């Protein structure tokens, strides 16, 4: 008793000292404030008593957001910002008198928060802040940013109630607030609670009867094991996780088209039923494509990052929505794994939490390197890349078998090409005869020729026909042609209204078909990503087909199923000149690789940059797509692309074979062979003669090539109907990330690089600066948030409400945990 009295006297003494300290700054506090101070706990805790008030009523003007900060005063950290007039740094204790004056003032011009803020402090809140100042105004890191402090429980602590550690913390809180625990639940209630908690379904009557008749602890544990091993357990847990991951069966936005992410959903169900560890569960969803020996299942998990809404409206700007998708991934990462509202920092520094706008875009850079363009790509069997082929085991076996056959056949072809020297030398021994054969053979495989020399007006005077240069070939249809001097005679020029379309069956090739295109073009200036021609669908449907662009006057040719992920692409290293005619030839060998694509400029092979290099499905037009038609080979205005305005086009030839270099040299200059004969320099071109012979005149090689192409077609038939799932996959070359002014995609500012908010935990420089490194950062033992967020979410899953009720927000604006010690102990 004597000790208690001494302790009480000591507290009274401290309390008096506290008020002497406060009153030294102000003559007298209002009586109502003093009364409220007397009702407060002996010690006011910054995180649990003071910070919620400051966050709600003060941080908007005196918090982390430097652009909105008033009076150069910060109340979210233990110092005032450096004064504009001197280098002095002031703490709250240094300005305590002014702060208390403003909190208690009745003068509207003096009072804080100001009346027009419409969030005033009540007397208890003012008293809390004043008492905290009197105690020394000590700041502490935000409760969720500090390392969990784990209480080591003794056997005596665990002896309460059922004997587990959770009950110790519950009992401690109930005793503190003077509440007795509820009576023990009946067996009927227990089994019902357990069944709903672990299966989401009521127990069966048989299970209820069996448990009522034997309600022992052993029987209860057996029920737990039974329910945890039930497939329903994974379904229940996945259902809750799907909400975290923003799962939906449609795209959202205006069109709201159907989509199928059920393979990812099934992966989540299996992960819970297999009791996958949480670090693996998260790492596979964030970066399953980047882990060592990534397989179909680990890549499938990354669909988590592609569950954002997807816009397929006609007028969207792709980069705008690509930026939206990156922001969505970043925001979801924050809410799902950090319990933070990162979206506030997309446009400005967070007003309540220490997350700057730069922090947001540094985090976003982890998700900004995905191989995507922002296009919807919603044609049948198409999806915006990156995507994963969802092959069955049987399909995998068939694909593997065909690929092995293709590899074997390719080796045979290489061997045969090397061994054909004897036949070639015999043919080469008579060069003039060989030249005649080349000239004659060049016309083989020519399936279309349009010289654009003759134009015949139709009834309305605006539409014209241009006759083909081959018998039996229908003429080209042209709207408002501009006719000028061409490569040979006349040429077709393009204005805003010019549209040229070939008959729909002309130039129709699949990705397994070899073909060549020869033509001349006259660029009239510099072109930024202008489409010269296209035998393809709209970019919204993946540029399905083939197309030619001028990108800063470099030639870019694309063959695609769904561009850019299911496509091959080449671009010349040099530009082609403007203001003059240039002869162009494009060849493709039908093998689905960028290495089989080549561009020739004025008869010479052009150095090119190859990309994409994965073309694994058919590029043929599907007539059942939505309401859009297919116009075949077209020149003129194209959807979503700049037009080849004022540009000329002439002498179009289409071949159903790969033209060899010597054939292309002859097509470019019909005097080529005459000069060879005159100058007798055949030997200089012997390799070109040999290539022609091997590709066209060696019957054994032709048979092997036909066998190879047949296998390729069979492989495409197997792969074509296989569904695909949107997943993650990074570009080989990192995409630059910038802070976006007010979050606007078209207003980049400072360039930033992959990093994490320093207020949470610095990013270890040893970690890879990609999504895998980000996942490893999440599970760093020093990370204060990861475990807390997941424990709180699991608690919510089973009890309906988390230990802190704002499961996705453990920041300053989030609810405080009801049982902070329990949350830390479980974490």
PLM-predicted stretches and their roles:
Residues 13-22:
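Bacterial N-terminal signal peptides
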Residues 67-68, 91-95, 105, 122, ...:
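Extracellular/periplasmic catalytic domains that process cell-envelope and extracellular macromolecules
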Residues 219-357, 363-364, 368, 517, ...:
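Extended surface/linker regions that mediate inter-domain or inter-protein docking
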Residues 126, 406-721:
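Extracellular glycan-associated modules
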Residues 1-7:
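N-terminal secretory signal peptides that target proteins for export/translocation
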Residues 157-193, 197-232, 246-293, 354, ...:
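Primarily short, surface-exposed interaction patches in extracytoplasmic proteins
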Residues 25-167, 171-172, 188-193, 203-205, ...:
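Solvent-exposed helix-loop boundary motif
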Residues 26-31, 110-112, 253, 274, ...:
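Active-site histidine-acidic residue metal-binding/catalytic motifs
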